[in-house]
């Protein structure tokens, strides 16, 4: 592994060329000790590539650097290893290697990416959390990028449901970005994994985020966009997903809402529409992934009154007055039912007398 770590450190040698080395049977160790004249037999190397390799070999201490890396307690895998995610092997420009803290996604389980706007609405926040939680209860892994907004909401929804979630970073795996997500970062390490193709210690840079998006989509079976503006980075993830042959789904939105522009545009391009979370989860869940459906889960917890009130709520706040006109209960009784739903975690009161679903 120490020679693979050296090859990974040559960041100016592209992933594509590292993959070609692998395909040609040229291991990292063989490259490290290859005579200078034989480097010219590797026709896809440029003179600059050969210069990078020769200069690195002259100054790089393989043993020392590998020992220093091992002290960081970070996992490391390359496309030459069996543990490398199979879903990434055949995408365009697969990362030669991955660093991770925690674990890599379980190859035997489905994964869904949930991404979207950083400056999301309260509605988008709730949808992302509820969707992630619903999928997690069916044993589906959640992939996202730990950015502010929808990414964070998706991770939180999964964790709150006891699921496994994985964050692909635009920095080194040992660099928490944004810093305010430190609590989330630590929780993901314990319940899933932090993943990056970048060398440990790498600070986040703007150019790294589009690069990591191809890994988010690549690790996933399905990509869901919750909210996205016209130039949202999550649309890059959607483009990668379509290029990789993955299904893309969106949460539809109001045509007057700038946060809906990206999703509505994807609908125009043929993306799937999530109009009911329970049905979406049911449709994509394969036999063997679930012990019970979402509706069964709720029926086991809610009584008839609670189920009725819950069915009338959405992820947009509804006033108590509007709600009272739709149920055959006195206002005092309705308040009691809502309070019970809040205690059970199914409903939130966003502002006094306005309620939304939280599950």
Give short role names for the model-derived ranges:
Residues 78-359:
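Glycine-biased, small-residue-rich flexible motifs in mid-sequence functional cores and linkers
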Residues 1-126, 130-137:
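Short, positively charged patches
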């Amino acid at each position: 592994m120490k020679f693979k770590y050296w090859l990974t450190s040559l960041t100016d040698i592209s992933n594509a060329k590292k993959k070609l080395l692998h395909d040609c049977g040229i291991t990292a160790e063989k490259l490290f000790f290859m005579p200078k004249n034989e480097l010219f037999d590797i026709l896809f190397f440029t003179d600059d590539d050969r210069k990078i390799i020769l200069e690195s070999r002259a100054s790089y201490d393989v043993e020392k650097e590998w020992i220093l890396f091992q002290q960081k307690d970070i996992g490391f895998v390359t496309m030459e290893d069996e543990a490398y995610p199979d879903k990434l092997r055949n995408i365009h420009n697969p990362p030669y290697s991955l660093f991770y803290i925690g674990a890599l996604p379980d190859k035997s389980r489905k994964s869904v990416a949930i991404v979207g706007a950083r400056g999301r609405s309260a509605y988008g926040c709730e949808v992302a959390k509820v969707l992630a939680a619903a999928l997690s209860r069916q044993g589906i892994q959640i992939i996202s990028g730990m950015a502010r907004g929808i990414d964070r909401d998706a991770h939180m929804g999964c964790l709150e449901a006891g699921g496994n979630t994985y964050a692909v970073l635009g920095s080194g795996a040992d660099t928490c970005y944004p810093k305010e997500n430190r609590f989330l970062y630590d929780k993901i390490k314990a319940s899933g994994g932090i993943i990056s193709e970048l060398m440990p210690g790498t600070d986040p840079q703007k150019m790294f985020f589009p690069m990591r998006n191809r890994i988010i989509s690549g690790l996933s079976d399905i990509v869901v966009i919750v909210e996205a503006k016209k130039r949202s980075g999550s649309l890059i993830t959607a483009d990668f997903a379509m290029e990789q042959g993955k299904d893309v789904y969106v949460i539809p939105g109001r045509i007057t809402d700038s946060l809906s522009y990206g999703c509505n545009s994807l609908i125009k391009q043929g993306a799937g529409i999530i109009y009911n979370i329970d049905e979406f989860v049911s449709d994509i869940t394969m036999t063997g992934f679930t012990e019970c459906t979402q509706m069964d889960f709720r029926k086991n917890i809610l009584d008839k009154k609670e189920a009725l009130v819950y069915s009338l709520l959405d992820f947009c706040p509804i006033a108590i007055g509007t709600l009272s006109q739709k149920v055959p209960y006195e206002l005092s009784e309705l308040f009691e039912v809502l309070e019970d739903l809040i205690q059970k975690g199914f409903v939130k009161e966003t502002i006094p007398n306005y309620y939304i679903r939280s599950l």
